[in-house]
């Protein structure tokens, strides 16, 4: 299994990450599509080839082609939006009413349940450090019926995969 490849490749100092990966992959808080879509979207957001490759392989066993495309779409559109909305926030009130003017059609028609796409967008936004987008997507998934525990499960996946990507980069540079 690909997740096992990631875990076995982690150094001893990343044992907590290894254990967290195992626990999160067995999570029952999320549906299978929510879980593996989160793993895939976040793996893409880490920008780490090994993490993305290993997670992609395993996610393909759990997700439809539509869900794979939607998860990768969430990672891609959030890469754009997170930069734009962070900048808008930094620039202050003078920019609050400035129209974004960027196409974001995938958010309206992601090809999967809206709540799943929004959850993946939230997880990616946490990796990318966009407070505005994280809060906006949290509000949407809460209104769609997800619990705080389900939302935080996606955040834990994001945090753990980012840590795994960091450990892999550290080891590659040693």
Curated annotation (Swiss-Prot):
The keyword Disulfide bond is assigned to this record: yes
Could you tell me the superkingdom of the organism this chain comes from?
Bacteria
Coiled-coil region list: none
Arranged from A to Z, the UniProt key words for this protein are:
Antioxidant, Disulfide bond, Oxidoreductase, Peroxidase, Redox-active center
- EC no.? 1.11.1.28
What is the catalytic activity of this protein?
N(6)-[(R)-dihydrolipoyl]-L-lysyl-[lipoyl-carrier protein] + a hydroperoxide = N(6)-[(R)-lipoyl]-L-lysyl-[lipoyl-carrier protein] + an alcohol + H2O
Catalytic positions are 130 (proton donor), 133 (cysteine sulfenic acid (-soh) intermediate)
BP terms from Gene Ontology: cell redox homeostasis; response to oxidative stress
* Function, in words: Antioxidant protein with alkyl hydroperoxidase activity. Required for the reduction of the AhpC active site cysteine residues and for the regeneration of the AhpC enzyme activity.
> Its family?
Belongs to the AhpD family.
Q: What is this protein called?
A: Alkyl hydroperoxide reductase AhpD
UniProt source species = Corynebacterium diphtheriae (strain ATCC 700971 / NCTC 13129 / Biotype gravis)
Q: Upper lineage ranks?
A: Bacteria, Bacillati, Actinomycetota, Actinomycetes, Mycobacteriales
By which gene is this protein encoded?
ahpD
